[in-house]
Amino acid sequence: MKVCLDEDISPDVAAILRSMGVNATSVHEAGRQGFSDREQLELASAEGRVLVTRNRNDFILLTQEFFAKGLPHAGVLILPWTIPPDNFRLVARRIAQYVKRAGDSPSEYLFDFV
């Protein structure tokens, strides 16, 4: 499973994930700060990446819309706010554990919590 971290997750987490063997990038690294949630999801899906975000409410609606319209959707993982955003190692560890359990091919329209 390849992941892309949304704007609300530090790009430092992507670097830690890569050091753990996870294929990870971030919106920050790609220079896509300020893009709409829809654009972030479209771009991540075009790259075959599951988008990891803390923005649950907006991405629930977008996932429903993408499914209803049959638009490409590689998946969304929600990182809960109970995990401190400045604890980069803990954030990375939780994402890496999920990726390891999920394997290489997430299901289309995946929507889950890390």
Can you annotate each of these PLM segments?
Residues 16-24:
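Short helix-loop-beta junction
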Residues 23-35:
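Conserved BB-loop
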Residues 37, 43-62:
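Acidic, metal-binding active-site segment of PIN/NYN-like and related structure-specific nucleases
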